């Protein structure tokens, strides 16, 4: 029997017992030998999950053991080689007092229940990183009955949920990830979703608008006759920082009773995004993190969300400064925030900002998606995005997704057309029902101290539908 014990932390250990895995290990024993630490070793080889594993083991010590579960029963493994390019080699052999697993369990200073193998592996895996639970089975819907509680704040008739979160100090090389799970709780349609944090380092924040109304937020005007609340940075206001933009599928789980030949619907849709770019805005701080799903359904949607911090030895350059410039996702749509129609004017969006020192290797993290109308609307027509810094074009591209049909099994309530396609199959302006939209990193180079104006223009179509 193989007994594994892992000390997760000072006050908790986990144990599993397995009587079959050693017997299932199959090796090809080869004639090659070599000496490691003065002991003659023989070679065994096996293939696991398309990986070739070579073990060099000795029987001269009359003990058995290995760096991993693999080879525990063939002798004392002193070297393990994976695919010829990853090597673990013993550097020292030291005799210690024999320890029986049963005694180790008995003498343990912590209580440790014997777990099944899958649960054991899961707990050991999760112990390697820090998990910050944000939301668990929270409803995002449209209802006058939506109320805040001690931990979750609700705004815009329940379409926004908000929580104050304290983040640990994150080291320079750590990686941060955002995970969100969504299910329909009644709404059958694909909806815009956004996960965001609220900067509070200026005189006014977006939280003021949530609490006092969108009309209290700074107004942006570009000459098209409309007023847009809280979308661009000013000297006294920072807009929302969007951690992830995602799109719900058509009615996942709630509408899985809809039957189609050879379609086995998924019951939940997972979204996962690397948010390491926002490390400096999160590390060691207490901030408001929110999620928005635009909908007018009383049942709405159900979500769970975590943020995880992963230790890493990555040598890649890490951001050391984060400046929010604009966010046109109108998360307060259901509380009067104007829809982002500003791109119907040639001026588009302009934001002016000032840097008090040089910033090297600056980049703009840009998320763009097109919406509105039917077959001729911006959702279904490619539109060129052009970005200019101080009047000079720095980037342009046409955001477009052509792989939406790959996510059909997330979309049970997607409408089917006479041409053999379903609504969720159709290509769209940089998004698909049931996916997150990937940010674009735009290189700005080294920015000297001074004042800059960033402009974004998109040839927005006329209203339709």
Model regions: which residues?
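Extracellular/secretory-pathway and virion-surface proteins
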Residues: 105-465
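Extended soluble regions of mature proteins
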Residues: 1-124
